[in-house]
Regions:
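Active-site bordering "gate/hinge" segments
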Residues: 2-415
Length: 415
């Protein structure tokens, strides 16, 4: 057993043994989140067993729903991942902080389905460490722990794993050796829409109906769509007089349901000498999850949830953290610099026509202070400059093809 496997087993066992050792106000929070984590631990075993491949469509739907249940519809109103509910239940001192922890735990389905043991373990350990801090404090002093103690646990979670966060971000941009999504796209029976559930994303009606619609199209039509998409990318280099023959990879970003088109596009790109880079949009707020999504992604289980937690970084964003993140990104770019220099840029499939999203302005959202806003702008600026240092903007391109969300409309393209 590896060290990481031992850590995973210890954290898992501790979660399953959570006891009633504190006032009901906090006990409910830890019990409900422990129950959710217990469901995900069973999901981890189920995915690892391979049983998913033989499961019925109805069973797959049940599993998918269980991963996202408390973010769905009206369930979110009484979820500890909802800032206003968490504040009402946990109080002014801990409401926002423990809500941010709950939100971070909701990123776990992505790590579960990719069988990313480290990504799972560090989030289980975050929860266990915070639980133990509360349990020990109530046992020893009959009082809740100091806010600073719990905030420091969350801060050091973000800071200690900044190296992992940065490595993920850069690898997901340029490393064509990633196989998770590619294996599904290239090897699954795409005529059987059960394949959609293997991605570990929320599967809504749009993904389901889109995949069914594309399955009903002849191969010639699929190829024509893929050709329009990939030719747009090639012509971008041609028109800008940029050397495509120097490049070895292209990042494919798309919403789930388009797998038949993406599979055909992959073959087109390979004929150009480009290997596909296909990675998930960030699932974790610590890794950059937001309303606007990059990479491959499923349905938006709850855009209000994404909006509510975009500024959870207010709990750890300071000069020290920014310096560490930039240092970690620099190290990650150095690690992947040979892949970065031959990266051609993103080829994007978009969907338009979604119902407009108007977020509710909740009273207890975390917000960045003026100083933090300044720091974040500085971080974004330096991170962007670093990207341009390793992927020369004069030698990369971009294309986008867009389709209406509703499959009842005629498909249209823009490149």
């Amino acid at each position: 057993m590896t060290v990481m496997e031992e850590r995973f087993e210890l954290a898992s066992q501790r979660i399953l043994e959570i006891e009633k050792r504190m006032p009901e106000q906090f006990q409910r929070y830890f019990a409900e989140n422990a129950d959710y984590l217990g469901v995900l631990l069973e999901e981890y075993k189920w995915v690892a067993s391979g049983a998913m491949r033989e499961a019925s469509l109805q069973e797959l739907e049940r599993h998918n729903e269980s991963c996202f249940i408390d973010l769905m519809g009206r369930n979110y109103e009484t979820s500890y991942a909802n800032p206003d509910w968490a504040y009402a239940q946990l109080g002014e001192t801990f409401g926002q902080l423990l809500c941010a922890v709950a939100a971070e735990l909701r990123s776990l389905p992505a790590f579960i389905y990719e069988q990313d043991l480290e990504g799972i373990t560090i989030r289980l350990e975050l929860f266990v460490e915070i639980y133990c801090a509360f349990a020990e404090s109530f046992e020893e002093t009959k009082e809740a722990p100091e806010y600073s103690r719990i905030r420091d646990i969350f801060y050091w979670f973000a800071s200690d794993y900044a190296e992992l966060t940065a490595e993920h971000a850069i690898r997901h941009t340029v490393d064509w050796g990633q196989r998770f999504a590619l294996d599904i796209i290239e090897n699954a029976d795409l005529s059987d829409i059960r394949y959609l559930f293997r991605f570990g994303e929320y599967i809504a009606d749009d993904q389901w109906k889109l995949a069914e619609h594309l399955n009903g199209l002849p191969e010639e039509k699929i190829q024509k769509i893929a050709d329009t998409y990939t030719e747009g990318f090639r012509k971008g280099f041609e028109l800008a007089k940029k050397p495509l023959d120097k490049k070895k990879s292209v990042q494919i970003r798309y919403p789930l349901g388009f797998e038949r088109v993406v599979k055909a596009a992959i073959e087109n790109f390979r004929k150009m000498g480009l290997e596909p880079v296909i990675a998930r949009t960030p699932a974790s707020f610590a890794e950059g999850r937001r309303v606007f999504r990059l990479g491959f992604f499923g349905g938006a289980v709850n855009r209000q949830f994404d909006y509510d937690h975009e500024n959870d970084k207010a709990l750890y964003l300071d000069k020290k953290y920014v310096h560490r993140m930039l240092e970690c990104r620099k190290n990650a770019w150095e690690e992947y610099k040979d892949m970065a220099v031959v990266h051609a840029g993103p080829a994007v499939i978009e969907a338009f026509g979604e119902e407009p999203f108007e977020p509710a302005s909740k009273e207890h959202l975390l917000t960045l202070s003026a100083e933090q806003q300044k720091l974040y702008v500085e971080y974004q600026s330096q991170a962007g400059a670093m990207t341009n240092e390793y992927i020369d903007p004069e030698e990369r391109s971009f294309t986008c093809i867009a389709f209406p969300v509703s499959i009842s409309r005629r498909f249209s393209t823009k490149c």
